[in-house]
Amino acid sequence: MQMDAVHPRVLGYLGRALSLELTAVQQYMTQASLVGLWGDQAAAERFREETVEEMEHAERIVQHMLSLGVAPAASQLQPVSHAPDLVGLLEKNADLEQQLIRHYDEASRFCQLINDQANGAFFAALLEDEQHHGRELEAWLQELGGRRRRGYARYGVGRRTTV
């Protein structure tokens, strides 16, 4: 696909996706170190695994952008979210995952609207991955008695997103 064939808004979605994924990498990496300092090595390892998964998403986005003939450029990263305990950190992560889910849902719907099947499928695959992450976070929060209950599996189904 040539760059001139890609809708400018799709390029915007890709750039924002890269920023959000790199924000997630930064957040999970920082939290892995933080909970390690707290002595919770099991949680630190889980955060390291999340870091790798989000880094893989960022790499997929970079590769996709390059395949479109676009130089990858993330915009500004969000600051790392802090909390005084593991449940608080997980709730902050759930908020970030929700941003990713909303973004990929909106991007895939826009691609459907303009009949861009290739980019729509790309965003839909990332959406599915992030919904899975969201369900994992929800389960971890429930294990710890967390306060949030989210419907990640159902997010985006039957919802209208303004495009």
Write out the residue ranges for each language-model feature:
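Iron-associated oxidoreductase/ferritin-like identity signal
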Residues: 1-163
